[in-house]
Amino acid sequence: MSKKEKNVEMGSPMKMPDLASYMQTVIEQLEADKKRSAAHTYTYALKSIAEFYGGAGMPMPVDEVFTPGRLKEYEEWMRREGMRKRKREPKGLSLNTISTYMRNLKAVYHRMVGEKVLPYNPKLFDDVYTKVESQTKRALELEQMNTLLCTDLRKLPSDLRCVLAYFLLMFLFRGMPFIDLAYLRKQDVKGNRIVYSRHKTGRQMTVRIPKEAMELMKEFKNRNPDSIYLFPILHKQESKKKRAGKVKKDKELYMDYLRALRGFNLKLEKIASLLLPAVKLSSYVARHTWATLAFHAGMSIGIISKALGHFSIKVTETYLKPFENEKVDAANEELIISVAGYNEK
């Protein structure tokens, strides 16, 4: 009988893996599978729970982490103490961030259950926040989107022109995410269409290029003949690597994208202050605006879902959920008017 079998027979407790080392293995696998976005969120989830436990290097045995009580303590800590990325912001993470980190932990837990590391508890995450929803309007009104679309780019400061152009192209390309715009290649343009694979899901998308986008593409296209990318969003770092005789790794390219995204969002804030005071602009707004305006124009949720490249209509519904209350309120007003005016008929 082996020592391991003898220990099990005698009832000796099996040593549980540490969450940090286990999650790091998961992150490395995601990196190997080129799932950069997932690896990025898992990395921040690990940093967050490590901070909750007292910092990197502190022991986090998984049988202690994955208990209803400890998960609830972690959730309450995130609501109260979890630091945001921008130090000027108050402590406490948003519900969306809390949900993301909890869902990351839930996925890790299910992986451990599948590997027989931990027993299955179907109610383990019942008391913590794991919802995927949006109660916040990220979409612009029709008039606001029209303001941006009709803006004379020549009147903007030079560093903001291409940023607004990219935002408009994202809207015109059926709410294309910024990451997909950044990774578009010159070869993806097939006549009057763009054929590309979504970075997040790998799903192939075909988008007809509207005439409103033609001029923007012509003016703001990548003019570097050595670059494979359609727009000069990742070109600076790419060129440096080529001059050094090195091939850029996917992970490095993704980090370039994250830097570009941060700069993009900061400049969108400046554009909002100039053109739409009191309105918050971010990379998400173009996508949500397209979905919302399409919804209000009478397009079915099924068509909107397909246009956005969602695998499930449920994902699309989270985009449109903030407007459900508006429809209910409007219907309620019509009902009240109908009842109040009954005797006048």
Predicted regions and their residues:
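N-terminal core-binding DNA-recognition domain of tyrosine recombinases/integrases
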Residues: 27-37, 47-135, 151-154
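Short, polar N-cap/turn motifs at the start of nucleic acid-interacting alpha helices
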Residues: 187-193, 277-280, 299-318
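Active-site/catalytic core of tyrosine-dependent DNA strand-transfer enzymes
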Residues: 145, 210-278
